Amino acid sequence: MRRNFIALGLIIALLAAGGCTRRGTNCADPGGTIKIGVYGDLSGQTSSFGQSTKNGTQMAADEINARGGINGRQVQLIHEDDQGEPGKAATVVAKLINQDGVRALIGEVASSNSIAAAPNAQEAKVPMITPSSTNVKVTQIGDYIFRVCFIDPFQGEVMAKFAANTLKAKRAAILFDSNSDYSKGLTRFFQESFIALGGQIVSEQAYAQRDRDFSGQLTQIRSASPDVIYVPGYYQEVGVIAKQAKQLGINAPLMGGDGWDAPQLWDLGGEALNGNYISNHYSVDDPSPAIQKFVADYKAKYNGVAPDAIAALAYDAMMVLGDSITRAGGTECAQLRDAIAATKDFKGVTGVISLNAERNAVKPAVVLELRNRKFLYKETIQPGGIAPAASPAASASPSANTNAPANTNAPSNMNAPANTNARPAGNTNAMGANTSGRNSNMSSTNMNR
């Protein structure tokens, strides 16, 4: 028996050593097709988010491959369904790294799932870019974790400013998901910002994900007579909340974040959603030629479906990754990590993307009004303040970027040989155009899904 334990111990030690060797070997670029793992919810409660992520990343990868790939190498996306569950997200990311041998990861949308999966990427030194997880904790997990979206402190501040300055609200109620890192984070930052602007929180009510009866919480909120109601949840509950609020005679506008942005929201909430507001990453109505080309191409590829913000962010995440691989000269772990971290002034469809020292994107937000099954542009809020306009300012066409190659819809110089002896430089040659500008002096604390 003792010998068996010794033998078992030796086997475990050898396997551990072999695992470390394999992980170390994996840091070297294996050449050939570049495998990228994409994970998201394709069959669970937030499957709309996962499908948009899959569509956006695949569209970007197809465009890259059609132009000859990255330095002559094709890109292969391997999609995994995490069913919207944190534990499953961690499992599929481990599978993508250890079995599929992916060189980088894109995902997730929900912050709780990214927080669960990111430690596996960090430990393996596989760079991970989340398109749309806005909770501040995500990128704090380690230096291989990045995002191309703004973060929750900024998003909460955006709607507090809109409520106080544009809607002239003095009294706000909050209805949040007590099981969601995203919802709890937005609640905190909206509350802090609204109070700092002179507002009062008159009621704060909680619900649990998958709840379908919100009448008790809404009755409490109605009795507090708020001017606005902040509901920082996901679309599958928000649509039901909006309908029940109208049934109870509540006329105060509801406000939320990017978690509302899904086609299914309208099926759940219908006309009860009219006159409510959300913060989001871009507007599909922006007249920028680059954005309108993206929208038209997406509709052509996906049977007339318009790209929501999740799809646009996923597209940008893949394009940022492609550009970073080009500048890194390949997919060696540390070189690719450094190239992503050096991303600067990348002109994506959701705005100009520059990553700060915390690996968060510094960029503005837009406020959209819900009306007749559409998200209508209201105003842009910069990190430094509000920049209202009747409609989004048209961005320069891609050809106006004098630093870019003739085809500015691709990551810069995809087919050119990279200087592998140089530290990756910040990118200024990326696709698209700035949808609403940015403040390069924005504090990293004013930014979070």
Please place each PLM-identified region on the residue numbering:
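Extracytoplasmic "Venus flytrap"
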Residues: C27-G56, E80-G87, V109-S112, L175-K184, ...
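An alpha-beta-alpha
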Residues: I145-A206, V228, L321
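Segments of small-molecule ligand-sensing domains
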Residues: K301-A312, G322-Y377
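Beta-alpha junction/loop-to-helix N-cap segments that form part of ligand/metal-binding clefts
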Residues: T21-D29, S48-T53, E63, R67-T139, ...
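Hydrophobic alpha-helical segments within soluble ligand-binding/sensing domains
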Residues: A89, V148-R171, K184-L186, D213-S215, ...
